[in-house]
């Protein structure tokens, strides 16, 4: 989820924690514990300062793993007890653990996903039923916070909200299943589907759809139950002598291949005789432009002289970033 929603969840948890006698007398410590706990797994955002490949490789990776889900609450408890010696360490840890767990848990429901089961498995868990920012969830949480601030009992406010959100998530799972079924019906008339991706957008009734078959890639959107494919491209085969194998060791290309769950690749011969290899994530088509790509330029001597990975929303900006490195 986005930062604003995680903060809203942290404030909601703070409201509930005020009913814990061990936390009620230290509101400042309680609020810091729950809000920091709701945000701290995303501390890996600082890796953007290094480069995109490092950030993408680690964001929602190890910081959302099982060891760190256990480590973060211990760290928060230590810091809180250092500055607020009157707090109850066990209760601080318990609420911090809940906040961190909820952060990691809610993140698995969007299309970016997390490595929440690492080190058991490094697989990205992407349930793709909730958009990174869901205006309905955020609005409901904000209404709950306002009702609590004006004096309503937090149990009377947030327990019904939790029940409503559980129902909402169930509805989103059902909607995704229906859209996936409709999309497959359209494709199965022509080709055999190999991989299917369905994910929400910020609009309640609009979903992104991408399907790979044995011959083509189909990308489009679903509006209600109506699936419309706006892009159909013949798939480029991947053989052991393919040029893609020559660049898989490049940091940007390797990061893309580890991160993207559904993509295609294409090659273009440039004016100077070098070859451009472009990997395109089919999950991110907007306004006829794929925003998440990895790109590498390979010389005739099989040397990579430029490469880039990231989210870029125009071709001109992509080329500027590519040659800026």
Language-model-detected regions and their locations in the chain:
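C-terminal regulatory/interaction regions
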Residues: 182-325
């Amino acid at each position: 989820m986005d930062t604003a929603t995680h903060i809203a969840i942290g404030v909601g948890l703070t409201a509930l924690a005020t009913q814990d006698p061990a936390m009620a007398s230290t509101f400042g410590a309680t609020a810091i514990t729950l809000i920091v706990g709701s945000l701290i797994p995303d501390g890996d955002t600082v890796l953007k300062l290094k480069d995109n490949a490092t950030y993408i490789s680690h964001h929602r990776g190890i910081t959302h793993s099982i060891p760190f889900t256990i480590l973060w609450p211990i760290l928060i408890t230590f810091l809180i007890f250092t500055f607020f010696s009157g707090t109850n360490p066990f209760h601080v840890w318990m609420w911090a653990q809940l906040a961190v767990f909820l952060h990691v848990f809610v993140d698995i429901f969007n299309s970016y996903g997390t490595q929440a089961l690492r080190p058991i498995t490094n697989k990205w868990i992407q349930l793709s039923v909730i958009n990174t920012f869901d205006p309905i969830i955020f609005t409901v949480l904000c209404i709950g916070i306002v009702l609590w601030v004006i004096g309503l009992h937090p149990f009377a406010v947030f327990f019904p909200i939790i029940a409503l959100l559980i129902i909402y998530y169930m509805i989103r799972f059902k909607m995704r299943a229906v859209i996936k079924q409709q999309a497959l019906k359209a494709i199965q008339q022509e080709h055999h589907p190999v991989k299917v991706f369905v994910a929400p957008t910020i609009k309640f009734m609009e979903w992104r759809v991408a399907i790979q078959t044995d011959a083509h890639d189909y990308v489009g959107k679903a509006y209600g139950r109506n699936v419309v494919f706006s892009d159909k491209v013949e798939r480029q085969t991947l053989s052991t002598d393919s040029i893609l194998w020559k660049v898989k060791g490049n940091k940007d290309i390797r990061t893309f291949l580890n991160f993207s769950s559904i993509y295609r690749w294409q090659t273009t011969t440039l004016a100077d005789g070098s070859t451009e290899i472009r990997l395109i994530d089919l999950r991110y088509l907007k306004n006829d432009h794929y925003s998440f790509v990895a790109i590498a330029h390979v010389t005739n001597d099989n040397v990579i002289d430029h490469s880039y990975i990231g989210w870029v929303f125009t071709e001109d900006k992509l080329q500027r970033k590519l040659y800026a490195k």
